[in-house]
Amino acid sequence: SGNLLCVKVVPRIPILHAVPNQGESFYMDANGNSMPTDQFLLDLSLVTGYVTTEFAKENLLELAQFMNTQAPWNREIQQIHVTSNQRIELVPMKGEHIIVLGSSADVEDKMKRLGAFYDATSENMAWQRYATLDLSYEGQIVCKKKKNK
């Protein structure tokens, strides 16, 4: 008698789902803690490619938090992809283009530029002419046209 057990439970809420080219897929919470994905499936920012837990923790947490909370990006971006040289690309729901972020630095500014570009080209859907929209250059968007088939 008199024995008391106190348990403090702190829920970890994942903010991104990583499916790397090599290794096990994982969820990561806002504190950079990874957790296994075999227990449940959540609708989160999907990260693919050359992503490790360390890279995700150092480079993708802020980006995933931004994408999950900022309209319209939380519904317009379906995938975050990490290339073999660790450049970050976004795959939008609409269109057949790739959005090149480069790094996750200045993500808010980069996405403002992208939003302004989409707004300016939405009437004639001119953004569909491009294979890539590169936001990695400060203050500009460099567009690469699609190759003719």
Indicate residue ranges for each PLM-predicted region.
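Charged, solvent-exposed interaction patches on well-folded alpha/beta domains
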Residues: 1-149
